[in-house]
Structure formats: C-alpha cells, structure tokens
C-alpha cells in the first residue's frame, strides 16, 4: 500500500503586509501579519500596504469578503472628475475616471474630488496646488493687471466683469474668452489730416486727444473695436470743428 503524503508550505506575512489566499484559483480569505501553513493547492499573494492595491481578480468578488472590504479604501472617480490624492499631507497623484483601491492603516490618505466638467473651481483646492505640475494640465488661468478690467465670456455669452487679479478655471470643452481693456489714460493721435475751413482753405492738421475707458461693458459689449470707432469719431469731430472757422479765425484761435 502506497500512501501519498501531501506536503505543506509555510508563508510568513510581515508587518504592513496583507496576504490573499486562493485555493485552486478561487479567493478564500485575507491574512494579516503572522505565519501560516498551506496545502499545495493553496497559494498566497502578498501585498505591500503602503502601495496601491491592484486586484488580481474582479474587485467586486473580493469585496464580498467583509474583512477585506473593511481593510480597503475604494476610490471611484466618475467621468468629468479628477481626484487629488494627498499622502501624508502632500499631493501625491491625480487620478482620472476609474476605480482605485488602497490599503487602510499604513498610510494616511486624503482625497479631494473635483468636477472638471464645469468652469468654476468650487472645490477646496489651494492656489499652490492648482499650479502643481500634476494639476496644472487640468487648469486654465488669466491675469488681469491692476490697470486693467476684463469681461468674461463663457460659450460666447457674457458672464461678468473681472476686476484686477488672477483667475483660475477648470480646463474642459467649454469655451472661455476674456477681453481686457487698459483703464489708464491713453492718447489718440491724428496725423496729416486734410480738412477744409469754412472759407475752403485746405489745411493739413495734426491733432491728439486723451481718453480713458470707464465703462468696460459699453466699450466691449456694445461696440465692435471701440478704439477704431473712437478714432473715426475724433476725425469727424475735428472736421466739424475746423469747418466752423475761416482760416483767419483759426489763426486767432490757435494764437490766443
């Protein structure tokens, strides 16, 4: 009579490790720190708790084990979302749409989800994080200088006036356009303008005017290329003014 003796094997699970036991390829249970004996048809896969968990089989099957489900942190990121992962207080990674799993207990994780399908950044994300190399690809920004005002258009529709400052929005398919205006005093010049006086004397006039934009909505929303329109209005006003005087009268005006 021949008796076949099946050998057993010993597996040690170290601190900050987790073992998953499979029997004939089917998940059985989770192991914590300690030493264990197994039959040859059983296998143990060891995982480092300080690293993300990549499920060897369908995750939903593993999560049916209450002990394993309790040991895992499952992060679900939807379409048009990103998740910022902070590890021990520092930004570690940014995740796009998908499902991610991490072990609890070994590392202090914090996740901040953001809906990047909208424009406004309403999530609790600091400016320094928005400028981080991992987050910057998802962000667009515009700077309005202290001497400027701007108007914000979203999908071609006027949204609001922007005062001086730096503005950040999520980068997506929504069209964002910012029109700026310099609010400092500016000078408009007309050189070599040929104008007839009241007595038909032909003059070549050089003139200048100073102006300042005070109503940005009127300048940009109600007028197309307001500066060109202002130039034309200045030309017409100058012609009308000069045409109201004879040549001699103009000389008297200019020499007063």
Predicted regions and their residues:
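N-terminal hydrophobic membrane-entry segments
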Residues: 1-256
